[in-house]
Amino acid sequence: MNHTFMSKGANVDSWRPFAMRVGTVLLIVLMSCSSSSAYSVLTHEEIVDLLWTDQIQPLLLKRFPGLTEDQIREAHAYAYGGAVIQDLGYYPFGSREFSDLMHYVRSGDFVRELLLESQDVNEYAFALGALSHYASDIAGHPAVNQSVAIQYPKLRAKYGKSVRYAQDKTAHLKTEFGFDTVQVAKNRYASQQYHDFIGFQVSKSLLERAFPVVYGVELKDVLTHEDMAVGSYRYAVSRLIPQMTKVALQTHKKDLMRETPNFAKRKFLYRLSRSNYEKEWGKDYVKPGLGTRILSALLRYMPKIGPFKGLAFNNPTPQTEDLYIKSINTTVDQYRAFLEEVRTDTLVLANCDFDTGQPTKAAEYSLTDVTYAKLLARLADHKFDLASPELRDNILQFYSDLSVPIETKKDVVRWQAVLTELDHLKALAPEPTLAGSPAQ
């Protein structure tokens, strides 16, 4: 019997593309494990799917009657893109500053501006997708914070019953990735073929119009490699993350398949069944090909350090998975309520810190303090020339009580710069105005 694994000539050439793909995947993994989103990409896209038929599509048709099936499918791709846009900067060629601003500064105002600025069906779908990310992070991060504390007793002993992303980024990455993987293992998410059928699109023109209105900075000045960032993010969403999920599933599948039914889970599964149109649930993930098995073997023995830490996730416990399922139900309920407010032109979004779900204020969260200081410095460098009255009011309100323990105070030089920049802003700013009108 001939057991030759690789013969000369054509067989060698046939393995080269796979070797290149493995190398590419490993390289991008090294570059991309830094997201602070409450949910991973698959969950964000699933939130859109859960309300697509009953809520989102009717909104699109109400504003843009007569859409064809192809136009609706294309709009679905833009909704997917909007659902993950706040995390774009955390991927290769992105800008952490871009995503930090959307997470910690005027998070509600940004989504509101996308809705106001949208001009066609794809831009509108993109904005509605961004609204789903807002709902997801506000509802999802508190659950993830609690889950991290449950899964990591040492962190719970140090930080209490809720561990924030800034307090242990690796633990958050492992927990979030674990949640996505267990849902895939149990065939709950749309197949890769379905996501390929829909696609993934980013509305750059809408971003370019809305971003400077909200943050007083041109998009190109923050996201300097915009096309490369969007392209690499599209690859990560459509190929890398599903591939890494399959690899994780291959190494953890026995433990992940166990079910513990309860009311919250039954509600979640019922919602999944109602959104089950034109889908094959998860089959692409539970039948790994040869390439996935080889990559799984390689990564199984890779030291779980640095960017590979996320692949060493702890399987969710029944308690933490229940928290996750409840947070999904809460997210869907909240997103549905927001979409109804969009329909009735009554939408008002609070500016919340995405990592905690709490209203944004100074000294509430370290990354928020740091991000405000960086934005203030950037605006001051340009003499606040693009800062709207609303943005000026927002910054002055954030720094209205300088007695609280703002994170920036730990750097004396930087804090003195903040005080100087605030004086310059106060000299330019008119009296504070009332909050803006609802979005439509």
What are these regions (language model features)?
Residues R21-S32:
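Bacterial N-terminal signal peptides
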Residues A130, Y134-I138:
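Catalytic glutamate of the conserved HExxH
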Residues S36-A125, I138-K220, Q250-K254, R266-Q440:
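N-terminal, motif-rich segments that launch catalysis or mediate targeting to/interaction with membranes
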Residues K220-M228:
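Short, surface-exposed recognition loops or helix-turn segments adjacent to catalytic cores
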Residues M1-P17:
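N-terminal secretory signal peptides that target proteins for export/translocation
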Residues V230-L240:
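Eukaryote-specific, cytoplasm-facing alpha-helical/coiled-coil scaffolding segments in long proteins
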Residues I241-A264:
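Phosphate-rich cofactor/ligand-interacting catalytic cores and adjacent structured alpha/beta frameworks
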Residues Y134, D227-G231:
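A short structural micro-motif
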